[in-house]
Each structure stands twice: as C-alpha cells, then as structure tokens.
Amino acid sequence: MTTPLLLRAARGESVERPPIWLMRQAGRYMKVYRDLRDRYPSFRQRSEIPELAIEISLQPFRAFAPDGVILFSDILTPLPGIGIPFDIVESKGPIIDPPIRTLEQVQHLHPLEPEAACPFIRPILATLRQEVGDRAAVLGFAGAPWTLAAYAIEGKSSKDYIQIKTMAYREPDLLHKFLNHLATAIADYLCYQIDCGAQVVQLFDSWAGQLSRQDYDTFAFPYQKQVIQQVKAVYPDVPIILYINGSAAIVDRMAATGVDIVSLDWTVDLGTIRQQFPPSVGLQGNLDPVILFAPQPVLKERSLAIIEAGRKGKYIFNLGHGVLQGTPEENVAFLFDWVKSLA
C-alpha cells in the first residue's frame, strides 16, 4: 500500500502536486448532508453514532475525492468526558450550562479516559481508514485549550469573550489551572485518535486570534505547546497542524509551538510567511472561503496564486476557514479538480 499524498506532503517529502482538503468539507453546503440532517436533527447523534459520522465524513470523499478525509465531529466532543456536559442547538451553536467559573468547578473535573468517554471514535476512524485506503489520509482533530476554555467559561459562542478575559485578568491562577487540565485531556484525546487510525491531527484554536500578543503568550501559546509536546512524546512521527482564526499578529509564534504545519487564515500573505518560516515548518491554506462564491476564473486565479507561493516548501492547500453554508457545490468540485490538475 502506498503512502497517501497528504501524509507524504505533511512529512516534507517531495510530492507531485499540492494535496487538497477543506476545513468543513462535510457539512451544510452539501445537499446529501442536509438530507441526512433532516432525518437526524441532533448534531450529537450525527457526530456520535458511528454509522452517521462515517457516512457524513465520506460524503465529500465520494463527491470530490479530497486528499484528506477528516473525522466528522466537534471540538467539544471530549468535554463530557472530563465532567463538562454540552449540547449543540441548531442555529444557536454549543450551550454549556452551567458554565465553568469557579475553583470548585475546576477541582471537580476529572481526567479524560477517551475509550470510555468517546467509544464511538474508534469505529469511526477505523472504518474511515478502511474505506479510503491509500487514496486519502485520515485526519483527526481537537480544540485547543484556550478555545475550549472560552466555550466552557462563556457557556456559549461569544463575540467579545468578556467572561474568560475577565477571569484571565482577575483570577489568572484559576484560568491557568483550568487550561492545564484541558491541555492534558486534549493531548490524551489526540493520542487516542491516532491510536484509532488518524494519520494526521489538527489542533483548532479558533478563538486565540481574539487575544493580544501578550495574552496569547500567557494563556494560549504555552498550552498549545503542552498539547503538542505530549502528543509528540508518544507519536513523534505523526504530523500535527495548528489552526488559529485571525492569526496575523501572532503567526510567527505559531511555528514556535513545535507543530509540523501552520494553517493560515486568508488575512495572512502566505508567500511572506513562507519566507519567514524555516523549511521544517509546513504551511496550510489559505483561500478566503467566500471566493468559492466567485466565478470560476476568479477562483482559479486566486487559488493558483496561493499555490505558487505555498508549493515552494512543505505545503497543503486548504481554505483560510471552513466552507461556508450556501457555497455552490459545483465550485467546490471545480476547486478540487483544478488543484488536482496541477500534477
């Protein structure tokens, strides 16, 4: 069996073309997903019943043959396993009630035992490996400590992050205690995913871009690094990708976490970053997801410019964020075909 293209690229091997997969490549923009969602309206059902999660993960693989197939799940999935229940409400997003705001709550959290807390992960990843074979790499993922803490402390999605930032400034020791607990749990969860079959893993710190550089270095960076070091201690050869939305002010720090690949949002010039980073650090990204609504010649022109900058080193083509609801499926198909034609 040959090694999948994306895995070879992530390791820094010479490849015939840039591999391509898209964040949120499975989801609401696809009619087959919407049809399945109508039958199974609970997100927790769709992501935690193996047959459903496998089907959803494979929908874009069947439609577009991406070079990476990512586990259909949510960054909050491991939280109940440490004692933080959550629900996902359609059109509202995640709800955590009660939110985590006291020392007593943090002290009552327990270590994550992934096999017991998330038993559905093993059959999902094992089946995905079986289904895609060497035609694509199977990716796992997790939320980073700051982002998971933001959800848990705010109790829901937020635009201003008043609760977690107030804790950072008023009770930093409490927040550090919580972040440390999360970092250990996330590292254990990623190691479990790798044990179950994930060949590459991505760490999403979606809300770390909301921090000043000083606060990033205090509350996000050390815990990203802790997760990465703990995973690398067990699986040194498994590539790890780090994604932060809104990373322009801190992108240089991302490389210092020890990740193999930095995933960039679309506000960052990929060519400039390529020149600044050492060759050992790969790049992923970073097409603006809204360009998928543009005419196909524009899509072709913009993606080519990014690829030309990226392919001068270790590189994976992706968007700068997830595929948006309402994105034309035919443009997603065009993008995959176009990038794969560059061999």
Swiss-Prot record:
<feature type="binding site">
    <location>
        <position position="151"/>
    </location>
    <ligand>
        <name>substrate</name>
    </ligand>
</feature>
<keyword id="KW-0963">Cytoplasm</keyword>
<dbReference type="GO" id="GO:0004853">
    <property type="term" value="F:uroporphyrinogen decarboxylase activity"/>
</dbReference>
<keyword id="KW-0456">Lyase</keyword>
<dbReference type="InterPro" id="IPR006361">
    <property type="entry name" value="Uroporphyrinogen_deCO2ase_HemE"/>
</dbReference>
<comment type="similarity">
    <text>Belongs to the uroporphyrinogen decarboxylase family.</text>
</comment>
<dbReference type="Pfam" id="PF01208">
    <property type="entry name" value="URO-D"/>
</dbReference>
<comment type="pathway">
    <text>Porphyrin-containing compound metabolism; protoporphyrin-IX biosynthesis; coproporphyrinogen-III from 5-aminolevulinate: step 4/4.</text>
</comment>
<keyword id="KW-0627">Porphyrin biosynthesis</keyword>
<dbReference type="InterPro" id="IPR038071">
    <property type="entry name" value="UROD/MetE-like_sf"/>
</dbReference>
<dbReference type="GO" id="GO:0006782">
    <property type="term" value="P:protoporphyrinogen IX biosynthetic process"/>
</dbReference>
<feature type="binding site">
    <location>
        <position position="321"/>
    </location>
    <ligand>
        <name>substrate</name>
    </ligand>
</feature>
<dbReference type="InterPro" id="IPR000257">
    <property type="entry name" value="Uroporphyrinogen_deCOase"/>
</dbReference>
<dbReference type="GO" id="GO:0005737">
    <property type="term" value="C:cytoplasm"/>
</dbReference>
<feature type="site" description="Transition state stabilizer">
    <location>
        <position position="74"/>
    </location>
</feature>
<comment type="function">
    <text>Catalyzes the decarboxylation of four acetate groups of uroporphyrinogen-III to yield coproporphyrinogen-III.</text>
</comment>
<feature type="binding site">
    <location>
        <position position="43"/>
    </location>
    <ligand>
        <name>substrate</name>
    </ligand>
</feature>
<protein>
    <recommendedName>
        <fullName>Uroporphyrinogen decarboxylase</fullName>
        <ecNumber>4.1.1.37</ecNumber>
    </recommendedName>
</protein>
<feature type="binding site">
    <location>
        <begin position="24"/>
        <end position="28"/>
    </location>
    <ligand>
        <name>substrate</name>
    </ligand>
</feature>
<feature type="binding site">
    <location>
        <position position="206"/>
    </location>
    <ligand>
        <name>substrate</name>
    </ligand>
</feature>
<feature type="binding site">
    <location>
        <position position="74"/>
    </location>
    <ligand>
        <name>substrate</name>
    </ligand>
</feature>
<comment type="subunit">
    <text>Homodimer.</text>
</comment>
<keyword id="KW-0210">Decarboxylase</keyword>
